[in-house]
Design a protein with these regions (language model features):
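Compact alpha-helical subdomains of small soluble proteins
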Residues: 88-142
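Bacterial signal peptide processing site
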Residues: 17-21
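Post-signal peptide N-terminal segment of mature Sec-exported envelope proteins
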Residues: 25-47
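Extracytoplasmic/periplasmic, Sec-exported soluble proteins
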Residues: 70-77, 115
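C-terminal motif of bacterial Sec signal peptides marking the signal peptidase cleavage site
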Residues: 12-15
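Positively charged n-region of N-terminal signal peptides that target proteins for export
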Residues: 1-5
């Protein structure tokens, strides 16, 4: 009987290991400069850096050109999408933490200007289309 207990104890010890999770996030050292989009406005002292392989090429080739959407239209979408994004960041067991890593500090009462709203809007469209996510009640379209 003692040998059964010892055997079970050894089996229990051997089975108590942590799972080896392999992260599918891109290695930041292997990302080219072309895949980094930097948006800065020195007047209100903010900076947005988007590090997403393929986004810059998508922005230049597929996204609607600047001026296509009004700033008001993009701000409305950005507010809704950022709220949902931040909600998902805070729920890593329900949503993939590799997709939703950091919160976006986007405050509706601040006028970020056209360029920031344009690039944030297009990144959120790109993100939803690339990763098949829906951040709002409507599908993003180009």
């Amino acid at each position: 009987m003692k040998t059964v207990y010892i055997f079970l104890l050894i089996l229990l010890c051997l089975s108590c290991g942590t799972a080896n999770n392999v992260s599918e996030t891109p290695d930041l050292q292997n990302i080219s400069e072309e895949d980094i989009v930097r948006i800065a406005n020195d007047d209100i002292e903010y900076e947005i850096i988007i590090i997403e392989p393929g986004f810059n090429a998508w922005l230049q080739s597929i996204a609607r050109p600047e001026g296509y959407y009004s700033q008001n239209y993009m701000e409305t979408r950005n507010i809704q999408w950022v709220l949902e994004w931040n909600r998902r960041v805070l729920q890593p067991f329900q949503f993939d933490p590799n997709l939703y890593q950091l919160q976006i500090d986007y405050q509706p009462q601040i006028d970020y200007g056209y360029e920031v709203n344009y690039k944030l809007f297009n990144y959120l469209v790109y993100f939803q289309m690339t990763y098949k996510q829906r951040l709002g009640g409507f599908m993003p379209r180009i």
